[in-house]
Swiss-Prot record:
Glycans are attached at residues 188, 282, 308. GO terms for molecular function: alpha-(1,2)-fucosyltransferase activity; galactoside 2-alpha-L-fucosyltransferase activity. It comes from Pan troglodytes (Chimpanzee). The gene is FUT2. Keywords: Glycoprotein, Glycosyltransferase, Golgi apparatus, Lipid metabolism, Membrane, Signal-anchor, Transferase, Transmembrane, Transmembrane helix. It is found in: Golgi apparatus, Golgi stack membrane. GO terms for cellular component: Golgi cisterna membrane. InterPro entries: Glyco_trans_11 (IPR002516). This is Galactoside alpha-(1,2)-fucosyltransferase 2. It comes from the Eukaryota. Its EC number is 2.4.1.69, 2.4.1.344. Its main location: Golgi.
Amino acid sequence: MLVVQMPFSFPVAHFILFVFTVSTIFHVQQRLAKIQAMWELPVQIPVLASTSKALGPSQLRGMWTINAIGRLGNQMGEYATLYALAKMNGRPAFIPAQMHSTLAPIFRITLPVLHSATASRIPWQNYHLNDWMEEEYRHIPGEYVRFTGYPCSWTFYHHLRQEILQEFTLHDHVREEAQKFLRGLQVNGSRPGTFVGVHVRRGDYVHVMPKVWKGVVADRRYLQQALDWFRARYSSPIFVVTSNGMAWCRENIDTSHGDVVFAGDGIEGSPAKDFALLTQCNHTIMTIGTFGIWAAYLTGGDTIYLANYTLPDSPFLKIFKPEAAFLPEWMGIAADLSPLLKH
């Protein structure tokens, strides 16, 4: 008797469903395995790229930053120093969020921000800087360096002057507000021929300089000499005075020529207005302090500063070198130290 065996029959639709289910389960398992592997990886500090013109498209390793200490002038010095030293050493530079909050509302700065959450995960090597350039700073070791100190010296960054001026370009609305104010000024009914920004640093320095640093702040005589220097050299100058001691300025600056305007608001917590006014002038009279130094540096033109304002044995001279703070072409007028000698 002939027996014919029929092949096992399995519906095609069921077969397709079976294959799809198995494939899906396999794919999900693979994805879960990858995610688990990523979770198990240790946290890595990124290697960051830079568009540094000096180094071209090469990758720059590590991360350099600087402590944000002090007010506007200090933080401008810290920013410019970080910018220059990082470029000199071929490292990417990042600024603290605090520094960004101080500078970004005023200037078109370009360095990226290092937020605190990221900074706390990095094994920093603290590196103290003097307030002047040292040869050893050209070859600073370490990939993750955080600078400390109060650097504010042209010796760090003057070779990059045009780049620094670009970094500290005022935002349009800040510049335009200052220029609008200056356009409205007159000298004895006529438009000024030259604008001279005057910054008079007082505030805490009035007490700190004589009591801590064996020094003085600018007095009436110094300011009179500085104003007369410009009056003798320029036709119809106008002096735009800013200060954190405006009441003292009104009492001690001679206004009999009709060429002095007390323009600044002197608010230390929001210095943009005063700083913008100074930098939109043609020349600068400063007294002491980094605010005035930076105003003069960005303005260009002629600059007069208070010179020799401490006694020779002042501890201030251990952390401050006048020749590293004031450009060689600026003109200093010696301070009157007699009030210190009386005591």
